[in-house]
């Protein structure tokens, strides 16, 4: 039996009505789940991020980051960075971390986004091919850590098995899952998913390091002598996975965080790399006044190297949640399936930047290194991704 007094206190009394329609099993699961939740924290999230949502319009303490521009490097500098990078990779100083917890829903595709194929080559394979090329160059397999989610973990692993890991050594491919967090209605109420459980969604890419630690892989990296983690996501089809130049740049600069950026277009809805209160960080486009966003010259493209010692030091530090509103399937009061705007709470990995003591940015050419695949048609679509991959001779 649910505690009516507690539920009323936190605006969740509707669950008592849901409980009346449930089987004994479902009631038990609901009760157990509610016991594991901190309803006060959930109410605070709702109040802070939805009811009192703030947009950053005062940037008096926000400045441009210091950055290098790849196109301004001399031939000698490029060769030197590449030499340093290949040597570091050969010595096992880098691991690669891929964030791939999403589904291909917006592409009109059922399945993990990474298994979506463009002209018979999946997004996973595009990245695996680059790691295989590095193996040929260095003689070393780089450990590849792939973050999945509850919604795609099993399918992702089965996909890799069906493709024989694209010829990569399966002992060097490691999967782990990101955590979930409850979703809420626009009234701040917990909702039920189509299986009559409290609806949860992946907690955003910011949980990547805690999940990596929980899986034991952070310790494994340390034991293996890894010094840097190269991080990227599955969305960018032109990503250069641990390209030797960036590896060498990372290794020589020896910063807590080394990041890639591109020159943003006016009005482009990507986060901006900025220096705020003496710390390099990312301000999300949705949290910035559009006119102010256009003042900054470096867009975040989700490609970074993190010093492993830095991650080990800060992995337990708290990160703030951010709000996203998505249409999600859920049960109505009669247990019918409906789709409604739902509040998702997400951690962003770049909020860990606030704890870094050193940071450097390398601006790279957009046309060579950035082509996000987000939509079935139009902007950032299958068509644009296909054209860019062909232009760069990647398919």
Curated annotation (Swiss-Prot):
Annotated GO MF terms: uridylyltransferase activity
UniProt xrefs under InterPro entries: Nucleotide-diphossugar_trans, UDP-sugar_pyrophosphorylase, UDPGP_fam
Superkingdom of the organism of origin: Bacteria
EC number: 2.7.7.-
Key words, A-Z: Nucleotidyltransferase, Transferase
Family: Belongs to the UDPGP type 1 family.
Name this polypeptide is given: Probable uridylyltransferase SSP0716
Organism: Staphylococcus saprophyticus subsp. saprophyticus (strain ATCC 15305 / DSM 20229 / NCIMB 8711 / NCTC 7292 / S-41)
């Amino acid at each position: 039996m649910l505690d009516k007094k507690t539920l009323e206190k936190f605006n969740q009394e509707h669950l008592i009505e849901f409980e009346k329609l449930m089987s004994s099993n479902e009631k038990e699961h609901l009760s157990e789940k509610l016991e594991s939740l901190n309803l006060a924290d959930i109410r605070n999230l709702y109040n802070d991020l939805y009811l009192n949502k703030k947009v950053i319009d005062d940037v008096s303490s926000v400045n441009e980051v210091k950055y290098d521009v790849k196109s301004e490097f001399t031939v000698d500098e490029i060769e030197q960075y590449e030499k340093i990078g290949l040597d570091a990779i050969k010595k096992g100083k880098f691991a690669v971390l891929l964030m791939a917890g999403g589904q291909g829903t917006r592409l009109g595709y059922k399945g993990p986004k990474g298994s979506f194929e463009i002209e018979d080559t999946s997004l996973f394979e595009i990245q695996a091919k680059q790691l295989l090329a590095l193996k040929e160059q260095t003689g070393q397999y780089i450990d590849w850590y792939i973050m999945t989610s509850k919604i795609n973990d099993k399918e992702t692993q089965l996909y890799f098995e069906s493709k024989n890991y694209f010829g990569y050594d399966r002992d060097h491919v490691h999967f782990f899952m990101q955590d979930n967090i409850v979703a809420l209605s626009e009234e701040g109420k917990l909702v039920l998913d189509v299986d009559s459980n409290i609806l949860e969604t992946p907690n955003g890419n910011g949980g990547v390091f805690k999940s990596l630690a929980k899986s034991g892989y952070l310790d494994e990296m340390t034991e293996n002598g890894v010094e840097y983690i190269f991080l990227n996501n599955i969305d960018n089809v032109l990503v250069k996975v641990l390209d030797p130049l960036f590896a060498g740049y990372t290794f020589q600069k020896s910063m807590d965080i080394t990041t890639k950026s591109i020159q943003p277009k006016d009005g482009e809805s990507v986060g901006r790399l900025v220096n705020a209160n003496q710390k390099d960080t990312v301000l999300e486009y949705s949290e910035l006044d559009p006119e102010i966003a256009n003042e900054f010259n470096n867009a975040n493209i989700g490609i970074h190297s993190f010093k492993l010692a830095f991650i080990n030091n800060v992995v337990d530090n708290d990160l703030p949640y951010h709000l996203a509103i998505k249409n999600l399937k859920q049960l109505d009061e009669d247990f019918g399936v409906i789709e409604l705007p739902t509040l998702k709470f997400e951690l962003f990995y770049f909020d860990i930047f606030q704890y870094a003591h050193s940071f450097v940015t390398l601006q790279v050419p957009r046309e060579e290194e950035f082509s996000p695949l987000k939509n079935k048609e139009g902007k950032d679509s299958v068509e644009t991704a296909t054209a860019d991959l062909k232009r760069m001779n990647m398919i």
